From Swiss-Prot:
Keywords, alphabetical: Acetylation, ATP-binding, DNA damage, Helicase, Hydrolase, Isopeptide bond, mRNA processing, mRNA splicing, Nucleotide-binding, Nucleus, Phosphoprotein, rRNA processing, Spliceosome, Ubl conjugation
Outcome of substituting R743E: Decreased interaction with NRDE2. Impairs the binding of both NVL and NOP53
Primary localization: nucleus
Residue ranges constituting the Helicase ATP-binding domain according to the UniProt record: 148-304
Organism (species): Homo sapiens (Human)
Stated name of the protein: Exosome RNA helicase MTR4
Residue ranges, annotated region (Disordered): 16-74
Any one annotated GO CC term: catalytic step 2 spliceosome
Similarity comment: Belongs to the helicase family. SKI2 subfamily.
EC number: 3.6.4.13
Residues that hold ATP according to the record: I139, A161, H162, T163, S164, A165, G166, K167, T168
Swiss-Prot/TrEMBL catalytic activity: ATP + H2O = ADP + phosphate + H(+)
């Protein structure tokens, strides 16, 4: 039905289909003058303005015309197809997840819903009989009681609540229950540091607990295993025995699933887990918790409860501190009401302080002028007894700079100083004497003794843990941290201070999102200790009340899938018998979220089709044919315009005084006069070539309002009833919608307003002289364009115009009315078509094309056969999950590692695991530069194969993802240098070096396994030697939590 408006009828010339270029421009040869695009003359005109009138009444068919009057069935009359299409689309219901959601009850600010398979009836939860698996010394909150009841009934539950609300209670209960029933339980967390802390907590509570993080394995046969999600994923792919005995899996911080890089691991894991396992998901507040539960229910055919609460045990007060001011403004009170008047006062202070505030930023090089704002606030917090405070900054450098400004202050008593020293010396006791003298270790102690701490990724892990312990013991009163501190670790303070409301997210500076603000500000207010938490936001540039309100009162970020394919995933799924990569795509949360849109689209199609059928057009066939002719003319007009706009044709005619018509999207300026034109070169973003841009300066009638505020580029046309002001506006060539054959005389000096306005009078004179519209330059006769393509288009135009004039409708008095109806109906047809495309897309599994491309790459590189059977190379790549498995496998099979020493191989592998940016590129010696070049050659080959397989890949970006910045550092460390020595070789933070080394050790272990898989003992021993070379001293000092 909808394709009734296609143009396949209109191949006017045999074997030459009309080129689809666009809409709306046509032309007519009239008395030898090219009269320009439709609509350019007044309605009365004899020019094509939607309809052409012509003296020609030749009804005889032109040879070249297609005799289509009889072949075209009534476009709108294909009723049956409509009905069929709807029913066909409704069969999508089979695809739709069959899940229903039942609301259970809502008690004391906590909602409880359950998602269950559509064919099951909801059975109310049974109250517990007998003793609880674990007793608590305090009264449980409503949401904790509800969640525990789900666990007692052996049903999965997602608990979504604020950080300090006490979600861990629900997890502990599930562990206690599993241990009592002699079942195994797995607790997974997103980061190793968090796993270590959780292990510590669980071990103190239950004893029968083990830990597996890739770095460390403790008691792997325990009934309760704490592990990172990556380890669980690889256990599932390996078909580990452990999985057979597991009854419960607890996912901590499930909102981490939206992490663009590692979130996919959660999804894979949840999909791979067997249906008989039950789950406890702990999450920060997410608005779409119910959707997640529906997915779990759809995936594992079991009910999944959602317990959601916005409750905060300690309410928060939010203040703004405007830079340059000296006081706090309460903008959200403890009841959660936004106080707009206070917000506006704060912004007023900011405006008044204006330039003063700008000068107060700390200089990166020198000190700051006088005490900084941060210093003022922290001092005030201490005086008012609002400590402990966490001060969040968005860069490691800022953290340290602010902390160093505090050195004049001292928040600890002598007693506390002694304790700090004792904890500190015990913590670093395991380090060698040399490592104890590292600058970072020596510098941090004096700060800690004063009750000031620093916490960011660049710190040595052992210092980071020491600081966490001191903070939780109340020995640090002011902690300067980056946002990673807000991840998971339950270490609340009384006050949270943001040093800035903007952050750099790798691409640009932006306001922090309300979700990030909620996560970080949630650290304020300690349960049972503070009656309220205090959050202070420092603002140094004006924000509108809308942005302010959105930030301070916005909702949490939804949990959206970050699922994407990886080669390791595809290969592992090809290796495992009972599951394939297609299954993984179909079952992903990504696909599920996509399916949820289907009912809306079906509804849209239905409504549009009803509207469509309501529009009745008399003599429909004939009207549609006429409509199509006009559409076709419009399209051809656009093509002609494209020829005219080619700089080589139009530039010679853009002399000063030439009348041109300017139209920019919705803004139609009408006729103006060319003043000048210039050529600007524009660098193309991807190729770096110069692309000349031609800018024409045109004198146009603009609205005075639009000229007030900014550059002339922002000028808007004057409204019909307004006099407007003539102004010279720079216009890109393609915005000229018509070029006239008329030229006017323009005054030499256009600065005086009167001179400019005089030109407007001249233009109006010309318009009076040509009531049928100002004559345009004829592309062939005037502009002398000899292009064969253009001649063809003009021939087609003549044929169509002839056809239009001879159409019975053309001179019909009701033409406009029926034509408008026809246009409306055609638009609905287009909408239906696009909605159906949407439906079709909704049925297809997303990313399936990418999967095909990836399989193509695997076949071409010899990792798998054409029938998806995994080859030797593929089995090797399955062993490597923490770095680029394709490239490493290729390097191994090409013998790239064979001639390298263990130290060289280790240094080369560091490129795969170092992820930060370093400003300086090390000067590499040939023994490192050689292997690096070979690796890059190998990577280029993979990029080439990927591009040939139609994968979107940019060779530059791909190559730059391997960062050689620490190669020399790792090489020197592997040859036995001290940590102090390698720190001096680079500007990378100590903590980042250690993180790189620990990742490297994990990769080396995987490389050992990979070498073992091909039976290359020599290579296996080389990688193992690499491990022993780097695994020493402070780099691998054990975590204090273990």
């Amino acid at each position: 039905m909808a394709d009734a408006f296609g143009d396949e009828l209109f191949s006017v010339f045999e074997g030459d289909s009309t080129t689809a270029a666009g809409t709306k421009k046509d032309k007519e040869k009239d008395k030898g003058k090219w009269k320009g695009p439709p609509g350019s003359a007044d309605k009365a005109g004899k020019r094509f303005d939607g309809k052409l009138q012509s003296e020609s009444t030749n009804n005889g068919k032109n040879k070249r015309d297609v005799d289509f009057e009889g072949t075209d069935e009534p476009i709108f009359g294909k009723k049956p197809r409509i009905e069929e299409s709807i029913t066909e689309d409704l069969s999508l219901a089979d695809l739709m997840p069959r899940v229903k959601v039942q609301s259970v009850e809502t008690v004391e600010g906590c909602t409880h819903e359950v998602a269950l398979p559509a064919e099951e009836d909801y059975l109310p939860l049974k109250p517990r009989v007998g003793k609880a698996a674990k007793e608590y010394p305090f009264i449980l909150d409503a949401f904790q009681r509800e969640a525990i009841q789900c666990v007692d009934n052996n049903q999965s539950v997602l608990v979504s609540a604020h950080t300090s609300a006490g979600k861990t209670v629900c997890a502990e209960y599930a562990i206690a229950l599993a241990l009592r029933e002699k079942q195994r339980v797995i607790f997974t967390s997103p980061i190793k540091a968090l796993s270590n802390q959780k292990y510590r907590e669980m071990y103190e509570e239950f004893q029968d607990v083990g830990l597996m993080t890739g770095d460390v394995t403790i008691n792997p046969t325990a009934s309760c295993l704490v592990m990172t999600t990556e380890i669980l994923r690889s256990m599932l792919y390996r078909g580990s025995e452990v999985m057979r005995e597991v009854a419960w899996v607890i996912f901590d911080e499930i909102h981490y699933m939206r992490d663009s890089e590692r979130g996919v691991v959660w999804e894979e894991t949840i999909i791979l887990l067997p249906d008989n396992v039950h789950y406890v998901f702990l999450s920060a507040t997410i608005p779409n918790a119910r959707q997640f539960a529906e997915w779990i229910c759809h995936l594992h055919k079991q009910p999944c409860h959602v317990i959601y609460t916005d409750y905060r045990p300690t309410p928060l007060q939010h203040y703004i501190f405007p830079a340059g001011g000296d006081g706090l403004h309460l903008v959200v009170d403890e009841n959660g009401d936004f106080r707009e008047d206070n917000f506006n006062t704060a912004m007023q202070v900011l405006r008044d302080a204006g330039d003063l505030a700008k000068g107060d930023q700390k200089g990166r090089k020198g000190g700051t002028k006088g005490p900084s704002n941060v210093f003022k606030i922290v001092k005030m917090i201490m005086e008012r007894n609002f400590q402990p405070v966490i001060i969040f900054s968005f860069s490691k450098k800022d953290c340290e700079a602010y902390a160093l400004q505090m050195t004049k202050l001292d928040f600890n008593t002598d007693e506390e100083k002694k304790m700090v020293e004792e904890v500190f010396s015990n913590a670093i006791d395991c380090l060698s004497d040399e490592d104890k003298k590292l600058p970072q270790v020596e510098h941090v102690l004096p700060l800690l003794k004063r009750g000031i701490g620093i916490h960011h990724g660049g710190l040595l892990p052992i210092l980071k843990e020491t600081i966490e312990i001191l903070f939780s013991e109340g020995l640090i009163k002011a902690l300067f941290a980056t946002e990673t501190f807000a991840m998971g670790i339950n270490m609340p303070a009384r006050t949270v201070l943001f040093t800035n409301a903007r952050k750099f997210d790798g691409k640009d500076f932006r306001w922090i999102s309300s979700g990030e603000y909620i996560q970080m500000s949630g650290r304020a207010g300690r349960r049972g200790m503070d009656d309220r938490g205090i959050v202070i936001l420092m603002v140094d540039e004006k924000m509108s009340p809308t942005i302010g309100k959105q930030l301070l009162k916005g909702s949490a970020d939804p949990l959206n899938s970050a699922f994407h394919l990886t080669y390791n995933m595809v290969l592992n799924l090809l290796r495992v018998e009972e599951i394939n990569p297609e299954y993984m795509l179909e079952k992903s949360f990504y696909q599920f979220q996509h399916y949820r849109a289907i009912p809306g689209v079906v509804e849209k199609v239905k409504n549009s089709e009803e509207q469509y059928n309501k529009i009745v057009i008399p003599n429909e066939e004939s009207v549609v044919i006429y409509y199509k002719i006009r559409q076709q003319l419009a399209k051809l007009g656009k093509e002609i315009e494209e020829y005219i706009h080619k700089p080589k044709y139009c530039l010679p005619f853009l002399q000063p005084g030439r009348l041109v018509k300017v139209k920019n999207e919705g803004d139609d300026f009408g006729w103006g006069v060319v003043v000048n034109f210039s050529k600007k070169s524009n660098v193309k973003p991807n190729s770096g070539e110069l692309d000349p841009l031609y800018v024409v300066e045109v004198l146009l009638r603009c609205s005075k309002e639009s000229l007030k505020n900014s550059a002339t580029e922002a000028a808007k046309p004057a409204k019909p009833d307004e006099k407007g002001e003539m102004q010279v506006v720079p216009v890109l060539v393609h915005l000229l919608s018509a070029i006239s054959s008329v030229r006017l005389y323009i005054p030499k000096d256009l600065r005086p307003v009167d001179n400019r306005q005089s030109v407007l009078k001249s233009i109006q004179e010309v318009q009076k002289r040509f009531p049928d519209g100002i004559p345009l330059l004829d592309p062939i006769d005037d502009m002398g364009i000899q292009d064969q393509g253009l001649k063809k288009v003009i021939q087609k135009v003549e044929a169509f115009e002839h056809r239009m004039y001879s159409h019975p409708l053309h001179n019909d008095p009701n033409l406009e009315t029926v034509y408008t109806l026809c246009e409306k109906k055609a638009q609905i047809a287009i909408d239906i078509k696009s909605a159906k495309r949407e439906l079709k897309k909704a049925r297809t599994v997303l990313q399936m094309d990418e999967l095909k491309c990836r399989k193509r790459v695997l076949r071409r590189l010899g990792f798998a056969t054409s029938s998806d059977v995994i080859e030797m190379k593929g089995r090797v790549a399955c062993e490597i999950s923490s770095a680029d498995e394709l490239l490493l496998t290729e390097m191994m099979f090409n013998g790239l590692f064979n001639d390298l020493s263990a130290e060289q191989a280790t240094a080369l592998l560091s490129c795969f695991v170092f992820q930060e940016n370093s400003s300086e590129m090390p000067k590499l010696t040939e023994q490192l530069a050689g292997p690096l070049r070979q690796m890059q050659e190998c990577a280029k080959r993979i990029a080439k194969v990927s591009a040939e397989a139609k994968l979107e890949i940019d060779e530059e970006t791909y190559l730059s993802s391997f960062k050689p910045h620490l190669m020399d550092v790792v090489y020197t460390w592997a040859t036995g240098a001290t940590f102090a020595h390698i720190c001096k070789m680079t500007d990378v933070f100590e903590g980042s070096i250690i993180r790189c080394m620990r990742r490297l050790e994990e990769l080396l272990r995987q490389m050992c396994q990979a070498a073992k898989a091909i039976g290359n003992t020599e290579l296996e021993n080389k990688f193992a030697e690499g491990i022993t070379k780097i695994k020493r001293d402070i780099v691998f000092a054990a975590s204090l939590y273990l």
